[in-house]
Structure formats: structure tokens, C-alpha cells
């Protein structure tokens, strides 16, 4: 492999990596019809996943991927079928950003407009975008720097 080809493969790898941070504005719920193999009939349950669903509020970009609003995805296996569903975690920060169309609360790596003094004593908001757990009959979304958010 020559140096030029190696550089292209590294650049392509970065492009693929960055594609994972593209915003997903839509929420979905559907049966997965196409997959390889057979789902065992006795495989039942739901796999939950949580992560930032968007990297912007309106036209403003979050300064760090830790600040994007949580989006919980559920993949459910039941009776040999697979269902997918995703929803944004409707935290006060998410609702405020959506309503106003821009970043309204300080994050881990994102400051609100107005400079350092406007951000100095404001707490870091909780986007509930890191983990998800079924506990005590309730589904909760987590963020390392804040309280769980019940869904």
C-alpha cells in the first residue's frame, strides 16, 4: 500500500466514524421485515440502547457529543418477529431547545450564548443520553453527571 492509499483509507475511516454523529430527527416504530437467518421462537425480550440522537438544536451545533439529547432505541423480539422503536428522551433541556429552536442550557462541552460570565454559575444540563436501564418496573435514561430520567 502506498502512502496516498493509506491516507485515503484513514480519511474514509474518519468519514465513516463521523457519519455516526448525524442527527436523526424522526422517531420510528416498525416491524423489521428483512434480516438474515431465523429468529428463534423462544427468543423474547427487548434490547434498549441510548445515545445522542442529534448534535444540534435548530441551527446551533452542540460543542461535544456528550451534550446531544438522548434517544432511546428499543429492539424487541417476540414470537419470531423483530420490532424497532426509537424516541427522544423528553428532558426539560430537550423540550426547551425544541421549543425555542436553539441551545438554551449549558452542557458539558457547550456554552450558551452570552460569554463566560453568563455560563459561569449555570449547572451543566442533563441530556439523559448515556445509559438506559429497566429497574423497579420503570425504564430510566441516564447521564453520568446527573440524576436518572424516568421514561
Residue ranges and their predicted role:
Residues 1-151:
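Beta-propeller domains
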Amino acid at each position: 500500500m502506498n502512502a496516498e492509499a493509506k491516507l485515503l483509507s484513514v480519511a474514509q475511516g474518519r468519514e465513516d466514524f463521523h457519519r455516526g454523529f448525524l442527527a436523526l430527527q424522526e422517531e420510528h416504530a416498525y416491524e423489521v421485515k428483512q434480516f438474515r437467518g431465523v429468529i428463534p421462537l423462544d427468543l423474547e425480550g427487548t434490547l434498549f440502547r441510548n445515545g445522542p440522537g442529534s448534535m444540534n438544536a435548530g441551527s446551533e451545533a452542540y460543542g461535544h457529543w456528550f451534550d446531544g439529547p438522548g434517544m432511546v432505541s428499543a429492539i424487541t423480539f417476540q414470537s419470531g418477529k423483530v420490532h424497532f422503536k426509537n424516541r427522544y428522551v423528553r428532558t426539560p433541556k430537550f423540550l426547551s431547545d425544541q421549543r425555542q429552536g436553539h441551545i438554551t442550557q449549558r452542557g458539558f462541552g457547550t456554552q450558551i450564548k452570552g460569554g463566560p460570565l453568563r455560563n459561569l454559575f449555570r449547572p451543566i444540563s442533563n441530556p439523559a443520553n448515556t445509559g438506559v436501564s429497566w429497574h423497579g418496573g420503570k425504564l430510566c435514561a441516564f447521564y453520568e453527571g446527573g440524576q436518572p430520567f424516568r421514561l
